[in-house]
Amino acid sequence: MQTAVVNRASPASLNRTGLEQAVNVSVSPLPENGSTVQAVIAGMLVMLAGTIPRNILFAANLRYVPSLPWAVPIVAVYLWIFWRYLSGDGPPPETRAWRRSSLRANPLSARAWTLALLAGGLGIVALVLGLWLANRMVVLPAQDASELAGIPPLTVWSLLLVAAPIAGIIEEAAFRGYMQRPIERRHGPAIAILITGTMFAVAHLDFTPILWPYYVAVAAVYGMVSFLTDSIWPAIVLHTAGNLYSNTDLLLHGKAEWQASAGPSELVWSTGVDHAFAMTLAAFLVVSAGAWLAYRGLAATATTPATPPSGQI
């Protein structure tokens, strides 16, 4: 699988481009097993350096010449440069090995790819079913596409669909790479996933405390795949697929996926356990069991990946 290789800009190059200061802080050399605080700071700075420019460009696109998605190619170029920098390219040479190791973009065998995507895919399906159940048990925050009204469809679809892989790449690099890897080496995957899941939740603008378990569950799906394969590539694919589903569902139905179940919208405490709730619960249990078995299979066959060729997996 060919990957977009990204040159890492060093403090000197970043200062010239206006990106350097943010990234330079996030990629200062850290020990391979640096402290939890260092890992959290590094991951959050990577996330901010990757998402803030995208958000600014997308907002500008919606305000200036909104009839054309002109921000898409600019963001794509920025992402390419940013990825290369995170993966070890560019100065300073003293941080190249640390950046490459922290990114965790290691190659995988075909078998590891298959099992990782199977386990993570079942995990995502279980998450969606779990959200449908949660929406019948508690009041989840509403999410709709009303703020996109009046924007040309070409621009809306282009920005939201392109946002899916961008978020997948940047957030996995930040949370499952730079942040999770050093924490799991010091404290194990459970604590690492709990911490990264919490920070993953805080990083989302729509976060409310009631959604914290959901974000930790998302971190568990992606984090365990990354831990068992020692690579963020499957998580990037899964994250992108999940975002594509969510964004497409939002545009087609005008509301979030957890509000789109076919059953009654009333809380189960008022309606009782109806047929829709029972069927969703049964599906959730079956899919969750399948995901658990798939993760066990992935754990049984996990191997240490070979050193990746430059820019490839």
Stretches with model-predicted labels:
Residues 48, 52-56, 211-270:
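Functionally important transmembrane alpha-helices
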Residues 240-313:
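C-terminal membrane module of polytopic membrane proteins
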Residues 2-33:
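Short, Lys/Arg-rich, polar N-terminal cytosolic tail immediately upstream
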Residues 170-195, 224-231:
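Membrane-interface helix/loop boundary segments of multi-pass membrane proteins
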Residues 59-67, 97-170, 181, 185:
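Juxtamembrane helix-loop-helix connectors linking adjacent transmembrane helices
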Residues 37-95, 112-116, 278-280:
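Alpha-helical transmembrane segments in multi-pass membrane proteins
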Residues 189-204, 216-219:
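Small-polar-interrupted transmembrane alpha-helices in polytopic inner-membrane proteins
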Residues 169-174, 178-179, 183, 202, ...:
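Active-site His/Glu-centered metal-binding helix of metallohydrolases
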